[in-house]
């Protein structure tokens, strides 16, 4: 093992000016890194660029603190080669669009030069958070991915109660429930598919959502033993915290462990080091790989440092 040094850790995220530090997982990760004396380099997606095949970014070194009124301070702004960093956390929220994909190409050039990128850029492209569950259909409800109105209509008539989701969003955005004989079926489907120009996901509605949508975190191939169960507010189909769901920390049950233990080594092999599984009842509904959340809520209630496990992994990889 080589002599330990203070690491240079970059992060690509949405504007830090807009976060709630009590709930923001990216902030919690940076706080743990700073506590260990590592240098933090802040970037937004439009700061990344390529020149002569080399990846660069306009970075800001940053200091942070737990004070919502004054929680960050930029120290120095400069352009650097991403090769100068030891690790980069790609924590940009969806939409998962072509701009996001282009950013992963830039990060992949740094990865090829030896920079540790979490999560692995290629796997961020390959593992769409909605579609990726199709590789694990033994754990999912009946799921259709299509942009054909006729196929969605037939699925609806077969199931009577369905959920429709865009493939590139997050936080419950654009999610619709269509019950039997809903007169709004056509307008919802036409809007989501943009008149058969965009794919969407259609799933059988799971009534168990009234008891919560569980977020199960997996770090470096190991499931965290507690989930954050998000309970929908009254009259709401979606349980996401972003739309008013209530969070409760609960132990994983036997089915949760079965799903998490099956997926964990597969995710690690793909370089997906920090992942959030969404489970309703005993069904896997999404695999969140871009910027999984709910770290703060679990750490607040339980004696576990999820951020510490992640930074331990980064240090072990760099120091080995």
Swiss-Prot record:
| InterPro entries (UniProt xref) | ATP-grasp, ATP_grasp_subdomain_1, Glut_synth_pro, GSHS_ATP-bd, GSHS_N, PreATP-grasp_dom_sf
**Reactions mediated catalytically:** gamma-L-glutamyl-L-cysteine + glycine + ATP = glutathione + ADP + phosphate + H(+)
GO CC annotation: cytoplasm
| Chain ranges passing through the membrane | none
Start and end residues of each ATP-grasp domain: 130-315
Please list the residues that bind ATP: 156-212
Q: Which UniProt keywords apply?
A: ATP-binding, Glutathione biosynthesis, Ligase, Magnesium, Manganese, Metal-binding, Nucleotide-binding
Task: Please name every pair of cysteines joined by a disulfide bond in this record.
Answer: none
Pfam assignment, any one: GSH-S_N
Give its E.C. classification number: 6.3.2.3
Annotated coiled-coil positions are none
Q: What metabolic or biological pathway is this protein involved in?
A: Sulfur metabolism; glutathione biosynthesis; glutathione from L-cysteine and L-glutamate: step 2/2
Cofactors that this protein relies on:
Mg(2+); Mn(2+)
Per the annotation, how and in what number is the cofactor bound?
Answer: Binds 1 Mg(2+) or Mn(2+) ion per subunit.
Q: Which NCBIfam families match?
A: glut_syn, PRK05246.1
Belongs to which family? Answer: Belongs to the prokaryotic GSH synthase family.
Name the UniProt record assigns to this protein: Glutathione synthetase
Q: From which organism does this entry originate?
A: Buchnera aphidicola subsp. Schizaphis graminum (strain Sg)
Q: Which gene encodes it?
A: gshB
């Amino acid at each position: 093992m080589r002599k330990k040094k203070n690491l240079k850790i970059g992060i690509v995220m949405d504007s830090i000016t807009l976060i709630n530090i009590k709930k923001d997982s990216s902030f919690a990760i940076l706080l743990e890194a700073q506590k260990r004396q590592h240098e933090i380099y802040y970037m937004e997606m439009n700061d990344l660029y390529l020149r002569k095949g080399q990846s660069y970014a306009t970075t800001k070194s940053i200091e942070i603190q737990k004070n919502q009124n004054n929680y960050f301070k930029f120290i120095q702004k400069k352009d650097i080669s991403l090769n100068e960093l030891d690790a980069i956390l790609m924590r940009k929220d969806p939409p998962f669009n072509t701009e996001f994909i282009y950013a992963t190409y830039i990060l992949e050039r740094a990865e090829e030069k030896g920079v540790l990128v979490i999560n692995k850029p290629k796997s961020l492209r390959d593992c769409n958070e909605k579609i990726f569950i199709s590789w694990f259909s033994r754990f999912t409800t009946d799921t259709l991915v299509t942009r054909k109105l006729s196929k969605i209509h037939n699925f609806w008539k077969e199931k009577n109660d369905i959920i429709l989701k865009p493939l590139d969003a997050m936080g419950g955005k654009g999610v619709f429930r269509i019950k039997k004989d809903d007169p709004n079926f056509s307008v919802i489907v036409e809007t989501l598919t943009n008149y058969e120009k965009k794919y969407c996901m259609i799933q059988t509605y799971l009534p168990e959502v009234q008891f919560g949508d569980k977020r199960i975190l997996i770090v470096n191939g190991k499931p965290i033993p507690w989930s954050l169960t998000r309970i929908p507010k009254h009259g709401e189909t979606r349980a996401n915290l972003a739309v008013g769901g209530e969070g409760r920390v609960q132990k994983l049950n036997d089915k949760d462990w079965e799903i998490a233990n099956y997926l964990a080594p597969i995710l690690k092999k793909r370089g997906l080091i920090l992942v959030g599984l969404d489970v309703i009842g005993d069904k896997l509904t999404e695999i969140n790989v871009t910027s999984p959340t709910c770290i703060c809520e679990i750490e607040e209630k339980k004696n576990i440092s999820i951020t510490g496990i992640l930074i331990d992994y980064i240090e072990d990889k760099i120091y080995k």
